[in-house]
Amino acid sequence: ASLYERNGLIELIKKTAKEIFIPLTVGGGIRSLEDVAAILAAGADRVCINTAAVQRPELISEVVKVYGSSTLVIAVEVIKVSEEYMVFTDNGREHTGLKVSDWVKKIEELGAGEILLTSVDREGTGRGIDIELLDLVRNCVDISIIVHGGIGSYEEVFNIFHNLDVDAACIASLFHYDTIYSSENLDRSVLGNKSFLLSNKKRSGLESISVKSLKDKLKS
């Protein structure tokens, strides 16, 4: 679906931007320069693009030309296939046929400022990030890398920033399950990883939460 077919997304961005005081990056359904303009006008600081960039790489340079490289994050979803790291889209469902090493070099060449590097194999498992993948991409590009997928403890977050050549880390399950729900018995290994995505099961362990409630939980 396009950005405008997603009911209330722009309003949600506006509301969120008013309630938080940290940089806001928005992704999902962004396919054109017009979509980028609408999201930034709604209050986002950056946009994150994946599928549209793979389908039409020149969109990267178009966005950079108008809004600058610091505004654009390119999401790169990766699955290891026969010992080769390959690029996927659609939450790890669509094989693009692109090698990660080739794609990240192209992303940098076209001017994007950051790469959100997701190991779909590790995502939601808490088994730690894929250091081999990170090293591969780091040796290919000089732009900022946000590592994502597999972070399972706060100690690992400390280690990432003190011992690895990475600029930022994206954390989801660790906050959702440990900080917000504090569920010691939740089997995180089956939520969010590749097998879970392909099974089409629902995330029964998650509950809806408002932005305000989330902020209050994080403060407590």
Each model region followed by its residue ranges:
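Structural motif corresponding to alpha-helix initiation and N-cap regions
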Residues: 10, 33, 56-57, 97-101, ...
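Conserved anion-binding
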Residues: 44-122
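Short gly/pro/ser/thr-enriched loop/turn and capping motifs at secondary-structure boundaries
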Residues: 54-56, 81, 153, 176-179
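Short, small-residue-enriched loops and turns at beta-alpha junctions
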Residues: 1-6, 82, 95, 122-127, ...
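C-terminal helical cap(s) of enzyme catalytic domains, especially alpha/beta-barrels
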Residues: 60-67, 159-220
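Catalytic cores of alpha/beta
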Residues: 20-25, 30-47, 132-171
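Glycine- and other small-residue-rich loops at beta-strand/loop junctions that grip anionic moieties
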Residues: 28-29, 49-52, 96, 118, ...
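Alpha-helix-loop-beta-strand connector modules within alpha/beta enzyme cores
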Residues: 3-25, 59-77, 126-153, 211, ...
